[in-house]
Structures are given as C-alpha cells and as structure tokens.
C-alpha cells in the first residue's frame, strides 16, 4: 500500500502528519504536484512534479495509484476518479470519500461552484487549524489501520 498526496492543495501540517504515520507504519508516500514543492527529508517520501497542464497532477495520481492505496486530496472530482478505481480517499480535514457519499459530495461541490460563479458566494474554506489537524490525524489512523487489515487479509488468502 502507498499513500498518495495531491501536494499542491494539501496543507503543510497534513503532509507532515502523513509522513509521520508513514514512517511509523513503514509505508511509501508519493507527493504529486504541478508546482515545485519542498520534499520532506525522509527516504519513504517521493516527490513527483508533473508537467504543467490542466489536471496533469490529478491524471498522474489516478494512473499510478492502485486499488488498496490511499490518496489525500480535497479535490472532489479527483476523489471520485480514485474511488472508482478502489483507491481510498481522505481529505486533509479528516473527511473520507467513499462510493456511498460521492454523489452528495459532487452535487454539493457543483452547487457551490455555481453559486460562486454567480457571485452569490465568495471565498473558500476556513484556514486549516488545530481542530482540522486533529480530525485528520484520527481519520488517517483509522483508515490506515483498516486498509492494512484488508491488505493483510488479501495477502493471506490463496490466489485463485
């Protein structure tokens, strides 16, 4: 299992938490970005800066991630693409994307985009704070535990 991060949009505090969890659990982290980033100084972390272009980093992430991997992203359409590929997805505020909630999340995202386009709503999310960081840490721990159990179960079953 690998952890993928949509690095352009992920808060630094969330990236640092992912690295800590990955070190503890001996997992690889792949940070994918469309803009140059500072790579954390850990051997388990890889940084891929893709050529610029609309959705180039998202496309790379979707192409490379495999079922059973985990992606950290706040981009709802990207999460939808990953979920369809059986890649788990979690946003940096600790909210998990899954097949059951994707329809609602896409509809809400589209509604908010329409309202912003019409000038009826401004701004974006609130700044990333300690409450977000704690919610993310808790959700990340739970999700990694579940994914590792599922991977262990698959590995212990005879191949057909």
Curated annotation (Swiss-Prot):
Q: What PANTHER family does this protein map onto?
A: UPF0178 PROTEIN YAII
Similarity-based family: Belongs to the UPF0178 family.
* NCBIfam families for the chain: PRK00124.1
Any idea what this protein is called? UPF0178 protein PA5247
The lineage is: Bacteria, Pseudomonadati, Pseudomonadota, Gammaproteobacteria, Pseudomonadales
């Amino acid at each position: 299992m690998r952890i993928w991060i949509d690095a352009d949009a992920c808060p630094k505090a969330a990236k640092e938490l992912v690295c800590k969890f990955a070190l503890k659990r001996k997992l690889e982290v792949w940070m994918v970005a469309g803009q140059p980033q500072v790579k954390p100084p850990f051997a388990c972390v890889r940084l891929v800066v893709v050529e610029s272009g609309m959705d180039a980093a998202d496309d790379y992430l979707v192409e490379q991630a495999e079922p059973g991997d985990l992606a950290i992203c706040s981009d709802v359409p990207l999460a939808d693409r990953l979920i369809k590929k059986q890649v788990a997805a979690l946003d940096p505020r600790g909210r998990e994307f899954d097949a059951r909630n994707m329809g609602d999340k896409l509809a809400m995202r589209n509604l908010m985009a329409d309202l912003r386009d019409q000038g009826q709503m401004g701004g974006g999310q609130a700044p990333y704070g300690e409450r977000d960081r704690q919610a993310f840490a808790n959700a990340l721990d739970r999700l990694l535990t579940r994914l590792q159990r599922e991977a262990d179960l698959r590995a212990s079953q005879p191949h057909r």
